[in-house]
Amino acid sequence: MDDLKALIGKVATGATLTREEASCAFDSMMSGEATPSQMGGLLMALRVRGETVDEITGAVAAMRSKMLRVTAPADAVDVVGTGGDGSGSVNVSTCASFIVAGAGVPVAKHGNRALSSKSGAADCLAALGIKIDLTPEQVGRCVNEAGIGFMFAPSHHPAMKNVGPTRVELATRTIFNLLGPLSNPAGVTRQMVGVFSRQWVQPLAQVLKNLGSDSVWVVHGSDGLDEITLAGPTFVAALENGNIRSFEVTPEDAGLSRAHGDALKGGDAEANAASLRGVLEGRPGAFRDVALLNAAAALIVAGKAKTLKDGVAFGTTSLDSGAAMNKLKQLIAVSNG
């Protein structure tokens, strides 16, 4: 506790924490040792000053050390967004996950209920008939038998219950909004991560490199989407062979047409589930295109596709052959089994 007081004092002066200090501070919070006032003080001091790569790396390390782990294939990928982009869009990364799985790449998806929309990944999947409140062993069975599994964050991060009330009372974004997507319980090293602000694209790629990821795309759409957007360019930081490269991609790079964000407005969980099922059944339109675009990037991360156009071709086959829809049916069956 005295250590935590010293670290809060350090941050209060504007100084930054080392990776080890941040890990120690967040361990205190997640173990329930820190008081609500101490948690709130540290979280807001970090937020106002701006969190560093070392601080985020240390915080993620602390969170990962307490999570309930899932056993998944070494080549599994995660397609995940921070949420909180305020767009209220359809569940793009969730739909893309089924396309990726249908293309033969195992998916260990990590997610939660809605942040700023009416339907987060967990809400949408539950509305599709998938049982989301599973044990780590049951999720591992889904990934290994169905080729796709969903890890509901509260089930795998029980230590987060110690910081939950403080986060609710602060009612503003904190470092915890970044930690979830970086703390996949299956320990995947191939990740496609969407973030709510361009400022985090490069830093989060660096954090994932620090923590041992192999292949990563961190993305932010120029229209604010925490996915690759159809509306214009998307900012990307890609980790490949130990190097981070920053660039932009457009729908045209993937052979797709642009579409305004309004075409992707979502509704509640039932409406978003119906839209997702429609894409898997072959319905054309902006939702299909944006899901293909994001799946294409995930297939690059997985090492299956070389370019976005390649990835779209694999994704199109996954949809048109019925393979993606079959993955949904398999996940419903195995999760409820």
From Swiss-Prot:
It catalyses: N-(5-phospho-beta-D-ribosyl)anthranilate + diphosphate = 5-phospho-alpha-D-ribose 1-diphosphate + anthranilate. Pathway: Amino-acid biosynthesis; L-tryptophan biosynthesis; L-tryptophan from chorismate: step 2/5. GO terms for molecular function: anthranilate phosphoribosyltransferase activity; magnesium ion binding. Binds 2 magnesium ions per monomer. Anthranilate 2 binds at residue 167. 5-phospho-alpha-D-ribose 1-diphosphate binds at residues 81, 84-85, 89, 91-94, 109-117, 121. InterPro entries: Anthranilate_Pribosyl_Tfrase (IPR005940), Glycosyl_Trfase_fam3 (IPR000312), Glycosyl_Trfase_fam3_N_dom (IPR017459), Glycosyl_Trfase_fam3_N_dom_sf (IPR036320), Nuc_phospho_transferase (IPR035902). Mg(2+) 1 binds at residues 93, 227. Keywords: Amino-acid biosynthesis, Aromatic amino acid biosynthesis, Glycosyltransferase, Magnesium, Metal-binding, Transferase, Tryptophan biosynthesis. Its EC number is 2.4.2.18. Gene3D superfamilies: Nucleoside phosphorylase/phosphoribosyltransferase catalytic domain, Transferase, Pyrimidine Nucleoside Phosphorylase, Chain C. Mg(2+) 2 binds at residues 226-227. Its cofactor is Mg(2+). GO terms for biological process: L-tryptophan biosynthetic process. Anthranilate 1 binds at residues 81, 112. One of its GO terms (cellular component) is cytosol. NCBIfam families: trpD. Catalyzes the transfer of the phosphoribosyl group of 5-phosphorylribose-1-pyrophosphate (PRPP) to anthranilate to yield N-(5'-phosphoribosyl)-anthranilate (PRA). Belongs to the anthranilate phosphoribosyltransferase family. Homodimer. This is Anthranilate phosphoribosyltransferase. The gene is trpD.
